[in-house]
Amino acid sequence: MSVMDAIDVTKPQAPKTSSGAEKPSLIGLSRQEMAAALREKGVAEKQIKMRVAQLWNWIYVRGVSDFDHMTNVAKDMREMLKQHFTIARPEIVEEQVSNDGTRKWLLRFPARGAGRPVEIEAVYIPEEGRGTLCISSQVGCTLTCSFCHTGTQRLVRNLTAEEILSQLLLARDRLGDFPDREAPQGTIMPAEGRKVSNIVMMGMGEPLYNFDAVKQALLIATDGDGLSLSKRRVTLSTSGVVPEIFRTGEEIGVMLAISLHAVRDDLRDILVPINKKYPLKELIDACKAYPGLSNARRITFEYVMLKDVNDSLEDAKGLIKLLKGVPAKINLIPFNPWPGTNYQCSDWEQIEKFADFINSAGYASPIRTPRGRDILAACGQLKSESERMRKTERLAFEAMMIANHGADD
């Protein structure tokens, strides 16, 4: 049986992609940094404000990836920009489409300086009323959460603001979400409005271990004169880097999600090892102090359901006690299988009992519908070596998919 459909990524009129040249990118620069870059290349001071406004509009509103498409920019200026800078997209190594419409891109970024090309994954999840893009912040991860596939890939490096934003730009390219663009044939997407209406920093890596680049990327993504995403439609998920939580609310101002997964320190030390450094009391205290926290701006607590590990009603009672006084929503996540894991997903009946108990205590407790499992795009499954999975592992994964099929019905 085939568990995925790979689609052709070499279509005509595709956005310009990186060729590996080490020109600096204008993507991800603040207006001040862009102005400084133009000034350094000899652009007259009296023109800089206008040129920055033009570039900002072409890059983030019109979505161009080639300076030659900037029709209101003088030809000599375009030639200078082409000579010294790039606005190209990352290379699409592979694009996969799940049976449920979820899309996963394996993206390759060129070497910068003494570095080497790196690969990351981004995932698009379409729903009737919205489209959510799951963005990566690091290549690999240091956290080694025991149930998470990404945690089995060592950290290579942080992504730059350019590389974080490029995931959003590329997704909008591929989905026809910029002006005068068409969506691919047969694409499952929201019926109206933006194709990418929400972004979640829930891909590969821990965003708060890459705070400065994530901050800059999200401030550009929510800039009203560019990509214009609402901060209420941007969610940053952390495993609990306590010192950076307050800064996230104060300096970025987006919605916060916490990868919780356990209500006892002894268990969370195993599932989410960062808990040894920042235990539950410190984490919850930081959540209570999150700027802007209210019933209208609740914190989302993510809780993966692991059979006979954290899914008892005693755990549910502990969860309610732990979150007392925190405006919260609790996302229950059926565990998504990946090759080599020793964990199993809780029985569906137990997940529903757990959810009902939480709900009766006054907390919204939606059960997240597993999306993109068949292409390793679901929560906890991302890993950029996935395209090199051995045949035996793929067969094992297909067997797991068949065994778990009933859990999603």
UniProtKB/Swiss-Prot annotation:
Binding site for S-adenosyl-L-methionine: G205, E206, S237, S259, L260, H261, N336
Entry-linked SUPFAM superfamilies: Radical SAM enzymes
Xref: InterPro entries: Aldolase_TIM (IPR013785), Methyltransferase_A (IPR040072), RlmN_N (IPR048641), RNA_MTrfase_RlmN (IPR027492), rRNA_lsu_MTrfase_RlmN/Cfr (IPR004383), rSAM (IPR007197)
GO molecular function: 4 iron, 4 sulfur cluster binding; metal ion binding; rRNA (adenine(2503)-C2-)-methyltransferase activity; rRNA binding; tRNA (adenine(37)-C2)-methyltransferase activity; tRNA binding
Positions contributing to [4Fe-4S] cluster binding: C141, C145, C148
Reported cofactor(s): [4Fe-4S] cluster
EC code: 2.1.1.192
Keywords associated with the record: 4Fe-4S, Cytoplasm, Disulfide bond, Iron, Iron-sulfur, Metal-binding, Methyltransferase, rRNA processing, S-adenosyl-L-methionine, Transferase, tRNA processing
Top-level EC class as recorded in UniProt: transferase
Domain spans labelled Radical SAM core: 127-376
Active-site annotation: E121 (proton acceptor), C379 (s-methylcysteine intermediate)
Residues in coiled coil: none
Subcellular location: Cytoplasm
Cited Gene3D superfamilies: 1.10.150.530, Aldolase class I
Gene Ontology cellular component terms for the protein in this record: cytoplasm
Disulfide bridge partners, by residue number: C134-C379
Membership in a protein family: Belongs to the radical SAM superfamily. RlmN family.
Note in the entry: Reaction proceeds by a ping-pong mechanism involving intermediate methylation of a conserved cysteine residue.
Physiological role: Specifically methylates position 2 of adenine 2503 in 23S rRNA and position 2 of adenine 37 in tRNAs. m2A2503 modification seems to play a crucial role in the proofreading step occurring at the peptidyl transferase center and thus would serve to optimize ribosomal fidelity.
The protein's name: Dual-specificity RNA methyltransferase RlmN
The encoding gene: rlmN
